[in-house]
A protein has these predicted regions:
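P-loop/Walker A phosphate-binding loop and immediately adjacent motor/lid segment at beta-alpha junctions
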Residues: 35-77
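Extracellular/periplasmic catalytic domains that process cell-envelope and extracellular macromolecules
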Residues: 16-21, 70-74, 136-138
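Active-site beta-loop-alpha junctions enriched in small/polar residues
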Residues: 2-6, 30, 82-86
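Short beta-strand/loop segments at the ligand-binding rim of alpha/beta enzyme cores
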Residues: 1-7, 74-77
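Distinct, well-ordered alpha-helical segments
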Residues: 6-18
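Glycan-binding loop/region signatures in secreted carbohydrate-active enzymes
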Residues: 33-46, 81-156
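Conserved, mostly hydrophobic/aromatic
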Residues: 25, 79
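Extracytoplasmic/secreted envelope proteins and their assembly/folding machinery
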Residues: 15, 19-22, 57-64, 119
Length: 156
């Protein structure tokens, strides 16, 4: 079964009991943040909480630990990744050069839909110099940013 890494989703199911009926539990370690919120920006697929929000619970690490605390066999947990990014445009009002501390005006122009960008498109545009690449060493999460437009994409 594929499940969200969000603790609020995990808590409503007794996975210690449910695991007996499952070969694996595919933990979706993505879609933590996105353009559905323009005032709460963050990593779409952070492994750990970022330094600017150390109490963030929407992380892969938190999801795995939450399942283990329920008594799930670690051999049943398979961490899934997305091959796309989520992003915003018009990011402004941020502090210390960190766009995630600001707010956005809407979703970034996407590949399939606004706010969602295919990984290949991100990689190709990085190679063409269209993005400023960054890596959050604390959260273990990459992102790209264009200061001129406030376009921000977080991906895994």
């Amino acid at each position: 079964s594929a499940i969200s890494s969000g603790w609020d989703k995990i808590q409503v199911v007794d996975y210690k009991q449910a695991q007996q009926y499952m070969d694996h539990i595919f933990l979706m370690s993505y879609d933590f943040k996105g353009a559905w919120s323009n005032d709460t920006l963050g990593h779409q697929a952070g492994l750990y909480a970022p330094a600017w929000n150390p109490k963030e619970t929407y992380t892969t690490d938190f999801g795995v630990k939450y399942l283990l605390a329920q008594g799930v066999n670690p051999k049943k947990i398979v961490v899934g990744v997305a091959m796309y990014g989520r992003g915003w445009t018009g990011v402004n009002g941020y502090k210390d050069g960190n766009p995630f501390t600001g707010v956005a005006t809407g979703p970034v122009k996407g590949t399939w839909q606004d706010g969602v960008v295919d990984y290949r498109e991100i990689a190709n545009e990085i190679a063409q110099g269209k993005w400023e690449y960054h890596y959050d060493k604390v959260a273990q999460a990459p992102y790209v940013f264009r200061k001129e437009t406030g376009d921000l994409i977080t991906y895994d």
